[in-house]
Swiss-Prot record:
Pathway where this protein functions: One-carbon metabolism; methylamine degradation
Lineage: Bacteria, Pseudomonadati, Pseudomonadota, Alphaproteobacteria, Hyphomicrobiales
Protein name: Methylamine utilization protein MauJ
Native source species: Methylorubrum extorquens (strain ATCC 14718 / DSM 1338 / JCM 2805 / NCIMB 9133 / AM1)
Gene this protein is translated from: mauJ
Length: 295
């Protein structure tokens, strides 16, 4: 079963609905804690190659007008594993967004300075005054069975697209996921080889299940029951935003914050899911054709 991998679209309540409602209704300025787990993208360990002992100093900053303290903490190995922001804010979600943007910038600068890879692995948010907490860490699904004989059928001309899809699935960055998934979808939309020029029958549509599984129901509900081709056409705008950031850094997808960042994550997820559907349908079509010829 396909599952969304991106962290950006996930922030789940850990406490009661009543505590979350109190937090949302509270307009007073108070302490909001935002902690980020960091990881090495190569080893996948939840720590980065910075000695925690070297970054003990508590930093003072102002993020979007909110006074903020930033503290770094290490794990058992002595490497930096978590960065915690204490923000004076009346809105936990706004505090989280400001902290996320700040840490993205800091990690980019640290990466340049040290030449080591580092990224965000997950986060937690707390509003102590209202006893409300949210958390986002990677989902750890159960293992699936695989029939090696059933998946042995993979036509040679499809293999380049299968590798593109693999890149989309493996991507931790929604922008990279969208680029690779869109490349598969664009090929399908244009009827270019290895896809058939003949329209698929029945024509694939965007189902409610696809929107729910990808998390895109809130930003792409209008595509429900619409031809998949219409979704692919709409995804071009998002693809262009990602490419624009490569040509004019800061003006494209990298500059997205708040709601726009969430939408990019969700659109990347539905592009991923849609690309998978087109490839699975194409493999099924060819297998059926081969079986028909054999009979």
């Amino acid at each position: 079963m396909w599952i969304p991998y991106d962290l950006t679209g996930s922030l789940k309540a850990e406490t009661s609905a009543a505590s979350i409602q109190r937090s949302q209704a509270d307009r007073s300025v108070r302490d909001v804690l935002v902690g980020f787990f960091v990881r090495n993208p190569i080893t996948q360990s939840w720590e980065i190659d910075i000695r925690a002992e070297a970054v003990k100093e508590v930093l003072m900053a102002e993020l979007d007008g909110m006074p903020t303290e930033i503290a770094c903490y290490g794990g058992e190995t002595g490497k930096l594993s978590e960065i915690i922001y204490r923000v004076k804010s009346a809105e936990p979600y706004a505090a989280f967004d400001a902290c996320r943007h700040d840490l993205d910038d800091r990690l980019a600068r640290w990466t340049l300075e040290l030449g080591r890879g580092m990224t965000i692995a997950g986060w937690r948010v707390a509003d102590p005054a209202n006893e409300a907490r949210w958390r986002c860490t990677p989902f750890r699904p159960s293992a699936l069975d695989l029939d090696l004989n059933a998946v042995a059928f993979a036509p040679d001309d499809l293999k380049p697209l299968l590798r593109l899809y693999q890149r989309a699935r493996n991507a931790s960055d929604p922008a990279w996921r969208l680029l690779n998934a869109y490349a598969v979808l664009k090929c399908w939309r244009a009827g270019k080889a290895p896809f058939s020029l003949m329209p698929q029958q029945p024509a694939p549509v965007v189902t409610l299940e696809m929107l729910v599984h990808s998390g895109a129901l809130g930003c792409a509900e209008s595509f429900k029951d619409q031809p998949l081709a219409s979704l692919v056409d709409a995804l071009e705008v998002w693809r262009d935003a990602v490419l624009q950031d490569l040509e004019a850094p800061g003006e494209g997808a990298h500059g997205l914050r708040g709601e726009a960042r969430w939408r990019l994550a969700h659109m990347a997820s539905i592009a991923d899911l849609a690309a998978r559907e087109t490839l699975i349908r194409e493999i099924a079509r060819r297998r059926s054709a081969d079986l028909a010829l054999a009979s």
